[in-house]
Amino acid sequence: MDSVAFEDVAINFTCEEWALLGPSQKSLYRDVMQETIRNLDCIGMIWQNHDIEEDQYKDLRRNLRCHMVERACEIKDNSQCGGPFTQTQDSIVNEKIPGVDPWESSECTDVLMGRSSLNCYVRVDSEHKPCEYQEYGEKPYTHTQCGTAFSYQPCFQIHERPQHGKKLYDCKECASFSSLENLQRHMAAHHGDGPRICKLCGNAFIWPSLFHMLRRTHTEEKPYEYEQCSTAFPAYSSTLRHERTHSGEKPYQCKQCGKAFSCSCYTQLYERTHTGEQSYECKQCGKAFYHLGSFQRHMIVHTGDGPHKCKICGKGFLSPSSVRRHKRTHTGEKPYECKYCGKAFSDCTGFRRHMITHTGDGPHKCKVCGKAFDSPSLCRRHETTHTGEKPYKCECGKAFSDFYYFRNHETTHTGEKPYKCKQCGKAFICCTYLQIHERIHTGERPYKCKQCGKAFRSSNYIRVHEKTHTGEKPYECKQCGKALSHLKSFQRHMIMHTGDGPHKCKICGKSFDSPSSFRRHERIHTGERPYKCKLCGKGFRSSSYIQLHERTHTGEKPYGCQQCGKALSDLSSFRRHMITHTGNGPHKCKICGKGFDYPSSVQRHERTHTGEKPYECKECGKAFSHSSYLRIHERVHTGEKPYKCKECGKPFHCPSAFHKHERTHSMEKPYKCKECGEAFHCISSFHKHEMTH
């Protein structure tokens, strides 16, 4: 077997070359080099068997250190090496490596142990001797020509070089370099046949090891397995980071609040929540982000051009794991199952949050009630329900406890909707709404109910639907005791009590929780009916009303009563019907105790006791207890008969007369006497018959 040359494992970039690399290339470089350093450390005692010169090894360390840090950093009293100390841009130190630390002198190109090294000690690591230290301030090495003094011999030796600081080797195409070796490597990478180009993403690399590392991100090869939990990783450095999740080690602390993290990059991201710094801004919609990963994910919303494509719908994603998660929306796969209640989840985050509801063992606890959460933001959001704090204030005076709701509210003033559907042009305030809307065009319904098989476009819709099977109603109104199955219904209900919806009608002052509800209400005042029935031309204020109306033409009755077999065309009628069997409506009549499903139904019923008839006909003055009775009566004056029999063509002015007539053709007799079994076409005949018993 051929021996491995030093150049096959040691990757050196000059600062000029480093500036030409992309972010993904730099990230891969760090992982490969950290791994290489560790491997070389392991064989450090037997250099003579591997034909690797010690100077090359030290150059390798120095070069890695040169590119392991980010942003310029000014340090006071930095005269030790005769120049300012800088941090090279576009990289982040993910973990500490023995002998690899970020503080570098721009004059001598050597690297010190850290900020503290400048104030206290200088490390000397020569010919593999144990580390020796010198007191800071002592500078035994003085340059005879310029008088500059150094405490560290390598700094002095580099300063003595006549070409120090000069770039003597020019690339005719683009840049200059301080050594012939660096120029040759640059020419191979950018102007020769040297670089290996990845066929999948187009990135180019000189070094085989860096190229192979990139390839693992595409093939998802993970050769480094952590023994304790068998989780595999593409890079050794990732394995070490993962190890901290088991050991609980968090060596990186936030300077402001002391919060600890397992990785320095997480600390840097977290510290931006204190400073408010959002370095990455989207030029298309203006949205700003704390860190690059979130920004890149956001840009895919605009471009749809992620490198990893879904084979089913072609949608692009930033990482293979994101594609896998997305595919589950097509397959319905939910690999994360709760051992306590059997509920399954498609992603790990949702599963972890759910488990906290059983174990109460989240890392972030509410100080008031002790409820646990998996993230500090969720905990803070919850705590505002106790304190009543609403820190996000709009210019209109309305305050919100959550930034997300605040941002959505702001769009009601600005009208800003940056996310636009490519097919119909409809715009939305957030990308989630756009994704759900796009499924209307594609017909995609990835969320299926396990009990009845019904499919839905959104996870919210299926959660609401599943509660119709379980009967779960977790949202209870403290004012009237009414329980509701989902949050939106609860919020709408609360507006009845508070009158504090964000959308207020200028004519009658009534409040609504959403713009769509508000627009529907406005049509009551304007008389606008934009939804027309294709069969009879009748107009309706809402799309849901026209859907119900069309069933009067088609005869569709999807809601069947299991107790008596009666079928109904709409859900509200079905619920009202069920109360006739159970008598268990949440809203009770104060006079007779009868239960109803809606407060409005109770009010209508109570008029049968009080005799109140608030709806009066303008033509003849006749009064009615309900608005629908008035509308039917008005057809007597207008001559309108919208309900036509398909069998004989006879028209009717009200649905009850129409349905009664239809039964003369179908011979259907839905009203059966329990005493003698005789059946009847209509309820009035049935009631008359009952009196004979």
From Swiss-Prot:
Positions of the KRAB domain: 4-79
A Pfam cross-reference name: zf-C2H2_6
Family membership: Belongs to the krueppel C2H2-type zinc-finger protein family.
Zinc listed as a keyword: yes
Biological process, per Gene Ontology: regulation of transcription by RNA polymerase II
GO molecular function: DNA-binding transcription factor activity, RNA polymerase II-specific; RNA polymerase II transcription regulatory region sequence-specific DNA binding; zinc ion binding
Stated name of the protein: Zinc finger protein 441
Native species: Homo sapiens (Human)
Any one cellular-component term (Gene Ontology): nucleus
Lineage, uppermost ranks: Eukaryota, Metazoa, Chordata, Craniata, Vertebrata
Subcellular location field: Nucleus
Family annotation (PANTHER family): ZINC FINGER PROTEIN (PTHR24381), ZINC FINGER PROTEIN 491 (PTHR24381:SF427)
Assigned keywords, A-Z: DNA-binding, Metal-binding, Nucleus, Repeat, Transcription, Transcription regulation, Zinc, Zinc-finger
